Amino acid sequence: MTDRLEVMLEQGIRELELTIPADAQSKLLHYLHLIVKWNKRFNLSGITSIQEMVPLHLLDSLAVSPFIEGNQILDIGSGAGLPGIPLAVVNPDKNFVLLDSNGKKTRFLFQVKVALELENVEVVNSRVDEYFEKYQKEFSLITCRAFSSLTSIVKMSEKPLAVGTQLLAMKGVYPHQEIAELEMFNEANKATTSVYAVKRITELLVPGIESKRHLVLIGSER
């Protein structure tokens, strides 16, 4: 089984045109085994097949890696650690804060951090809005995957976005409705808040996944 997973991961990485060292690939597969081991206890993923996790969890997250800019990354609603853990594994020169309000999931994330020896990862158990109320840490980028609507994410992340942090949101089908809602939010609040514009939308082609994937970059215009 392990050999098959290694082949699946290696092939997917080649198709994504990424270069990932063998030791990092081993950590990625170790991470999947940890998800499988603790899934029932911590309710980490609706996907139970480790073979399906290779494209749906690992490759889906790794497809975002070329778009990670800056050195201080905040992954909100991190859940089982997606995309934060895979991105931290393949970007050891960047620092990642994995944020989730579910205590069980952050306990799992801490176990992953220790097991994979990820010195560039910090795990925080907090709601997003409460985190920004308490902490003054500056981030270059906020990431999220299947977390909430674009407008909701912007509202709860408005404090860092207003001072230059950018948001990179992983979505499925092209989010026409969510973009329209964000434009309505901007129009209604432009007199009192910053305007949060969609800077770029990239369609991602993820090996082993037939459904649509889009990456939405949002930043403040003032």
Walk through the language-model features, giving the residues of each.
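Class I SAM-dependent transferase core
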Residues: 2-70, 74, 104-107, 111-121
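Conserved beta-strand/loop positions that form the S-adenosyl-L-methionine
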Residues: 76-78
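Conserved SAM-binding loop of SAM-dependent methyltransferases across substrates and taxa
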Residues: 80-93
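Short conserved AdoMet
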Residues: 69, 91, 162
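S-adenosylmethionine
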Residues: 94-97, 101-222
